[in-house]
Regions:
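Terminal helices and disordered tails flanking the catalytic cores of nucleotide-processing hydrolases
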Residues: 262, 272-427
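Sequence-structural signature of the catalytic-core scaffold of metal-dependent phosphohydrolases
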Residues: 1-86, 94-319
Length: 427
């Protein structure tokens, strides 16, 4: 099978990958937006998990093929190349409606649910991906055996502790866990694809040279290393991640709609108990984006859908950004407003998940002699790179639009009081 992709061009899928794509389990990814509710604010962000998964397959295959040709001593077989590609293809198979929103906010809001407490292994999409792959293989007779499925599953949800249980013919090195979803330094083909795909979808005119990063990838001391010449491309990749999160994924209107979608999912949960769908692969497949929009008779559900469609969304009335967790006196706010009239949102935005310079976790090598470069030389490659790599946000949204003016007045007074206090401290 050959697929034309607007990012990578023509993509050749091997016979097993083609068999996977031609199943209802995989085709459902067409009905899950890659970026959740983003399309409701940025209309061109209409791409799906389907395209991203095929793109990740392409880049995963490309990376391990490049490493294999460059380093034949690693003894990477065509079967291993195939399994890495399939892991890339299926890494997001377990995503449900609105992608990360379902996991990170809706399921998190149900942590007190008695049965969910015992189902933590099923909650995250990586584990659901493995469940659906096994279901797909059994139901649609995809030609993958248990040993191959073990490798694919451990690559999707990296488990180096399971490496010793692989058949010896697959044990080419623990570096193999750093291709699809890299727990070591966050450089992986999943990120390559979604950063390029998402920036193009929303019309942002910047990018990074992921092809160069793949070309220079080399296994040294059981780690995938990169030439120092790639350091600026890699840093640009992390900067783009930061900018997308700051400017696009966490846009004030996007988060406002997410607040309503979470409310909507909680109301649907009361009616249909959809959190339990994750126990059954067939029921899981029903949870695509369109699931929430139609067929509801419940008045509360219909009201929220109407608010979203009529753009009666929560309004941002206050925001604070800091290099440290933001302080906010909610008790004081409660003296003026009922708790159900506002929503407080806290989140972090950074180059990676933590505070440190992402380059500090990457092993670079000298392109001329192939030897690892000391950390000091890496750190000094630019004096202009910031030492701060994470910001903390606090937002307050007005949930009752009839109170919008009162909220604005409250936070205007708060801002003036805060500024006056800071001026007095300076004196």
């Amino acid at each position: 099978m050959i697929i034309y992709d607007n990012i990578h061009g023509y993509i050749n899928l091997d016979p097993i990958a083609s068999a996977i794509v031609d199943t209802p389990v995989f085709q459902r990814l067409r009905n899950i937006h890659q970026t959740g509710v983003l399309y409701l604010v940025f209309p061109t962000a209409n791409h799906s998990r389907f395209e991203h998964s095929v793109g990740t397959y392409h880049l995963a295959t490309q990376m391990i093929e490049k490493i294999s040709k460059k380093q034949p001593e690693l003894k990477i077989t065509s079967e291993i190349i195939q399994l890495v590609g399939i892991a890339g293809l299926c890494h997001d198979l377990g995503h449900l409606l609105f992608s990360h929103l379902f996991d990170d906010y809706f399921l998190e809001s149900l942590t007190n649910h008695n049965e969910l407490k015992t189902l933590t292994k099923n909650v995250y999409h990586e584990n659901r991906s493995i469940t659906l792959i096994n279901h797909m293989v059994d139901k649609y007779e995809v030609p993958l055996n248990k040993d191959q499925l073990k490798v694919i599953g451990d690559l999707i949800n990296p488990k180096e502790s399971e490496y010793g249980k692989w058949k010896p013919k697959y044990q080419v090195g623990r570096w193999i866990f750093q291709i699809i979803s890299n727990p070591l330094n966050s450089i992986d083909v999943d990120k390559f694809d979604y950063l390029v795909r998402d920036t193009q979808a929303v019309g942002l005119k910047f990018g990074f040279n992921y092809s160069r990063i793949i070309e220079d990838a080399k296994v040294i001391e059981n780690k995938i290393c990169y030439s120092l010449q790639c350091s600026e491309d890699i840093y640009q990749m992390f900067f783009i991640r930061y900018r997308l999160h700051r400017q696009i994924y966490n846009h004030k209107a996007v988060k406002a709609i997410e607040i309503l979608i979470i409310k909507l999912l909680i109301e649907i949960e009361k009616e249909l108990n959809i959190s339990q769908y994750i126990l059954d692969p067939e029921k899981m497949m029903e949870l695509v984006d369109s699931f929430i929009w139609h067929g509801h008779t419940n008045i509360s559900i219909k009201k929220i859908i109407e608010e979203i469609n009529q753009r009666k969304i929560p309004k941002l009335v206050y925001q604070d950004v800091s290099l440290h967790p933001c302080e906010f006196d909610e008790d004081k706010l409660k003296q003026s407003f009922d708790a159900n009239t506002y929503h407080i949102l806290r989140f972090k935005v950074g180059y990676v998940g933590g505070k440190s310079n992402p380059l500090n976790k990457i092993t670079f090598y000298n392109l001329k002699n192939g030897k690892i470069i000391s950390e000091n030389k890496v750190r000094s490659f630019s004096l202009l790179i910031t030492q701060k790599h994470q910001e903390y946000f606090l937002r307050v949204y007005c949930m009752n639009l009839s109170l919008l003016d009162k909220f604005n007045e409250y936070f205007e007074e708060l801002s003036q009081s805060k500024n006056g206090s800071e001026e007095n401290n300076e004196d």
